């Protein structure tokens, strides 16, 4: 059984699936994994006929703790330590920093067919919806301290309280420390040295903790959100889910302070881009927007779903990785077309769709599109029509156009020079002047064998290319190296049969003869 369907099968009663994000900067693609995982759990519950709601929170009362490298540091440095919702917007179209970055993320939700009910922490605090929980946790601070010590070995002092005030003098929230509570107000100090990235102003005083004047620390806040929203399912990343980590602390607070069961939880792994874990505030890795611009929505969902949640996804948008992603997706589409029964293998395909059905199409190989786009004077739409086994439906054409746009974007933004195909149409490339006698003999024989190639199609040409290596007993690697050097001046390239099929037969044979003539 697919992992999300198992969660749905075990769930009893009304379910609230929740996820959240701190909009500290441009949201990276790694954050999409949690979003898609929660969306799929929500869909699995709906698929199982169970009552369910999907909520997504914006943790915009968290402090700005770093100025991302892509923003003007001098402009935003004065706002370090401020709640994100109180920091100016980096651009037009949003009233503040938090909404500026989360709006872009929500656009990607829509692109991926994800439609949760969204909420902002500023609204929960300012409206008073968290007031009762603030009072509860301030009155049971000794229990909260006890949990921190038992679960995470964090020893809080006797005058520590689980609350941070927004300083009335300087507006920072990261620098304030609450050291007393009289039942209605907290006493706080905006300490100069409470963080390593910004100084507090030194102001102190008594203030009501209610109605948006401050926030709970996020492990405690997490528990308050669960209770207020009625959350029954919330997964968390591996970093939060380690023994003694933030999820263990939150679970224990939920049980020992509120005396309630925490939501169902199972950890999920990171997405690495080129082996690097991504960070929104540090700007490390590819942003969710960049990857959404590269991949069609179903393929981006499929990237998140083709591996188990507890398995790391290492996504390097190089030629091998991206062409394999499309190829794996097309394989499942073809299997579904033959037998439209939703087996466990096909559930990742089903949940990759934007709706509740799998729309089959005639797959056109993505790697072939990448090659075709690099052939001079070639009409790619005509080539697709000619190379397709059947006439294209409107939906087939839609998918092809989507993939052409993706391949163009990949070539422009992600392909390195070794992955690009530069055909030498006017003359024999320089590196083809250094072939071995064995390679030259192969080139000469291949020119003869290709004269009879009919039809001039990839499979036929690839067969002749291979059979000629056997005929002359030359290692295939040496033979292919000679071909690539003779046409693209590189030692490696796309399938030679496919490459030749894009070119005129007369040109290919003529080029092979030109190479041979260099050694006569």
PLM regions: where:
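A glycine-rich helix N-cap at a beta->alpha junction
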Residues: 75-108, 112
């Amino acid at each position: 059984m697919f992992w999300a369907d198992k969660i749905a099968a075990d769930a009893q009663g009304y379910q609230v699936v929740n996820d959240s994000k701190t909009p500290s900067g441009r949201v990276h693609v790694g954050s999409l994994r949690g979003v898609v995982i929660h969306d799929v759990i929500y869909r699995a519950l709906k698929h199982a006929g169970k009552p369910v709601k999907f909520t997504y929170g914006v943790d915009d009362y968290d402090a700005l703790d770093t100025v991302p490298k892509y923003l003007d540091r001098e402009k935003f440095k004065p706002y370090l330590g401020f709640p994100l919702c109180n920091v100016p917007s980096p651009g037009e179209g949003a009233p503040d920093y938090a909404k500026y970055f989360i709006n872009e993320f929500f656009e990607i939700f829509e692109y991926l067919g994800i439609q949760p009910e969204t909420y902002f922490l500023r609204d929960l605090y300012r409206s008073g919806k968290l007031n009762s929980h603030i009072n509860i946790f301030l009155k049971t601070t000794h229990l909260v301290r006890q949990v921190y010590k038992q679960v995470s070995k964090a020893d809080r002092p006797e005058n520590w309280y689980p609350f941070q005030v927004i300083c009335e003098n300087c507006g920072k929230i990261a620098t304030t420390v609450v050291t007393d509570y009289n039942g209605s107000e907290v006493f706080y100090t905006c300490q100069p040295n409470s963080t390593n990235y910004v100084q507090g102003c030194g102001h102190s005083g008594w203030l009501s903790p209610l109605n948006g004047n401050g926030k709970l620390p996020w492990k405690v806040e997490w528990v308050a959100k669960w209770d207020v929203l009625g959350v029954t399912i919330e997964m968390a990343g591996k970093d939060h889910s380690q023994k003694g980590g933030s999820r263990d602390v939150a679970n224990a607070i939920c049980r020992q302070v509120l005396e309630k069961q925490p939501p169902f939880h199972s950890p999920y792994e990171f997405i690495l881009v080129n082996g690097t874990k991504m960070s929104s505030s540090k700007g490390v890795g590819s942003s969710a927007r960049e990857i959404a611009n590269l991949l069609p929505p179903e393929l981006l969902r499929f990237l998140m779903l083709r591996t188990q949640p507890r398995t790391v996804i290492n996504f390097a948008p190089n030629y091998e990785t991206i062409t394999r992603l499309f190829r794996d997706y097309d394989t499942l589409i073809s299997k579904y077309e033959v037998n439209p029964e939703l087996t466990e293998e096909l559930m990742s395909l089903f949940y990759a769709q934007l709706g509740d059905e799998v729309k089959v199409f005639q797959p056109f190989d993505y790697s072939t599109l990448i090659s075709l786009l690099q052939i001079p004077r070639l009409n790619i739409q005509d080539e697709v029509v000619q190379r397709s086994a059947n006439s294209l439906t409107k939906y087939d054409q839609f998918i092809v156009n989507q993939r052409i746009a993706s391949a163009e974007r990949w070539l422009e933004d992600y392909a390195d020079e070794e992955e690009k195909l530069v055909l030498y149409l006017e003359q024999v490339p320089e590196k083809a002047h250094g072939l071995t006698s064995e390679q030259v003999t192969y080139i000469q024989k291949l020119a003869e064998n290709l004269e009879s190639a009919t039809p001039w199609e990839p499979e036929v040409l690839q067969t002749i290319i291979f059979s000629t290596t056997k005929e002359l007993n030359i290692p295939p690697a040496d033979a292919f190296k000679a071909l690539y050097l003779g046409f693209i001046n590189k030692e490696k390239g796309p399938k030679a049969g496919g490459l030749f099929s894009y070119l005129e037969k007369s040109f290919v044979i003529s080029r092979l003869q030109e190479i041979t003539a260099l050694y006569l």
